[in-house]
Amino acid sequence: MAAAGARPVELGFAESAPAWRLRSEQFPSKVGGRPAWLGAAGLPGPQALACELCGRPLSFLLQVYAPLPGRPDAFHRCIFLFCCREQPCCAGLRVFRNQLPRKNDFYSYEPPSENPPPETGESVCLQLKSGAHLCRVCGCLGPKTCSRCHKAYYCSKEHQTLDWRLGHKQACAQPDHLDHIIPDHNFLFPEFEIVIETEDEIMPEVVEKEDYSEIIGSMGEALEEELDSMAKHESREDKIFQKFKTQIALEPEQILRYGRGIAPIWISGENIPQEKDIPDCPCGAKRILEFQVMPQLLNYLKADRLGKSIDWGILAVFTCAESCSLGTGYTEEFVWKQDVTDTP
């Protein structure tokens, strides 16, 4: 893994945004909803997006738009992270990278307009420019179709059954029933834009103990209680946890820390990966940290409405150091999950 350098760290914050800002043609970084796919061809299929623990479809968690300056083949580049929110595992994680040159088959050569489009509706995209159909429930590749109407597409039998139960059974036989009005399947996470800001450097001598207490006090009672609860599980790892608290103190609402090749900040001294734990890319290159997802994101997900809640301390996403060329396909990368407490 690469050592920390002088590169600035970019922080991500969850903010509400109009639906049009979160569509693929705007190249968004976002949490929840359906994926705003970058390349419209070569999407990961149902098997690639199935939980390795329980086998059920993963939920889209977030995507980060991260183009690489000086790389014509990665003028557009995005990382997509998926997780399992089903009981009993609530743990499965998979991450994919996709990149495109500026001149491609899917987007204009010129930057997108910053003005809202003329239409006012918030229709759901169910077919990409490549012709690929998307699942009505999750927005991932939908190779399966309703055997009755042949108009509704799904990624899996599970999602077809869910949609059937929540209204497709009644609507299926009606003409023109698939007008992009999709019921709430209670599967997607709440949707937010990820707004990026550069982290201000915090000099150690500036954060005195009395100031530190004031900073932590400004973090909000709920978050302070959450972190104090985490602290109860710490023993010899106190220094690591205190470093974590100090690092996030000035921006306690950060949900993401981005910086290719930087060192992650861990929440615990346990389950920190060694270099041998991070598999090389199939191209032969090492993988380096691209970004880490912070526990603060859990406050936005409302995941406990399904029963047992998903949980993590840190999700560290590692990608190919060379960002190897992919054409229009999606390549799986690696994510390391550090828990606050041991998972039963």
Swiss-Prot record:
Keywords from the named record: Apoptosis, DNA-binding, Metal-binding, Nucleus, Ubl conjugation, Zinc, Zinc-finger
GO biological-process terms attached to the record: apoptotic process; positive regulation of apoptotic process; positive regulation of hematopoietic stem cell proliferation; regulation of hematopoietic progenitor cell differentiation
Subcellular location: Nucleus
Post-translational modification: Ubiquitinated by PRKN, promoting proteasomal degradation.
MYND-type zinc finger span: 135-172
UniProt tissue specificity: Ubiquitous.
UniProt binding sites for Zn(2+) 2: 146, 149, 168, 172
InterPro entries: PDCD2_C (IPR007320), Znf_MYND (IPR002893)
Residue intervals passing through the bilayer: none
Name by which UniProt lists this protein: Programmed cell death protein 2
